[in-house]
């Protein structure tokens, strides 16, 4: 039996709070059960040097964990003088996922940076970051539209992500930490709201998984992402 008696393909309770901080053009606190991530989207009227003069924009992201986001304190990466490999991998994943649903040409020469800071971690921090960042980015773009700097929101749709895994032979969606740490296979799936794939990251930690199990994992992810996109749309409608 899963924690909180969840069904195998059921995501944790989702809460998306917009305008969470006062200064960012888009600010969202996203909660998936006990995992909580603050996603702040900042608009800059500039682009990286290699994009200047091309008339197109850019979306990037940064990711980090507060020291006591986990059960024991984790030393700040700034104190070590550099970011860890896991952090760099995750923030690149977030940025790629966001750019996949943006018409960069329609942005003009603006750049949006989404900072994803994990306040509390209970599994699925990277997938929660992507799902929350999508809403924060939508608000940042709407800020540009409302201020007359863009004619229309250049987002082509929503992007959302979820973790799925195999615990024994059972396919589970949106793994909590206790499930993730025991899973034979752990996979992160990123999709558009239409169900098109953006990224699949999957590893067999224990027994290798079959093609049939892979398809079952992806189907479970699609069910979960459909639910997440509905929560994103509901949050933006309020």
UniProtKB/Swiss-Prot annotation:
Xref: Pfam families: RNase_PH, RNase_PH_C
Gene Ontology BP terms: rRNA catabolic process; rRNA processing; tRNA processing
Binding site for phosphate: 86, 124-126
Broad class of enzyme this protein falls into: transferase
Reactions the enzyme catalyzes: tRNA(n+1) + phosphate = tRNA(n) + a ribonucleoside 5'-diphosphate
Keywords: Nucleotidyltransferase, RNA-binding, rRNA processing, Transferase, tRNA processing, tRNA-binding
EC number annotated for this UniProt entry: 2.7.7.56
Record-linked InterPro entries: ExoRNase_PH_dom1, ExoRNase_PH_dom2, ExoRNase_PH_dom2_sf, PNPase/RNase_PH_dom_sf, Ribosomal_Su5_D2-typ_SF, RNase_PH, RNase_PH_bac-type, RNase_PH_CS
Top-level division of the source organism's lineage: Bacteria
Gene Ontology MF term list: 3'-5'-RNA exonuclease activity; tRNA binding; tRNA nucleotidyltransferase activity
Protein family per UniProt: Belongs to the RNase PH family.
Quaternary state and interactors: Homohexameric ring arranged as a trimer of dimers.
Functional note: Phosphorolytic 3'-5' exoribonuclease that plays an important role in tRNA 3'-end maturation. Removes nucleotide residues following the 3'-CCA terminus of tRNAs; can also add nucleotides to the ends of RNA molecules by using nucleoside diphosphates as substrates, but this may not be physiologically important. Probably plays a role in initiation of 16S rRNA degradation (leading to ribosome degradation) during starvation.
PANTHER family, per database record: EXOSOME COMPLEX COMPONENT (PTHR11953), EXOSOME COMPLEX COMPONENT RRP41 (PTHR11953:SF0)
Protein name: Ribonuclease PH
Gene, per the UniProt record: rph
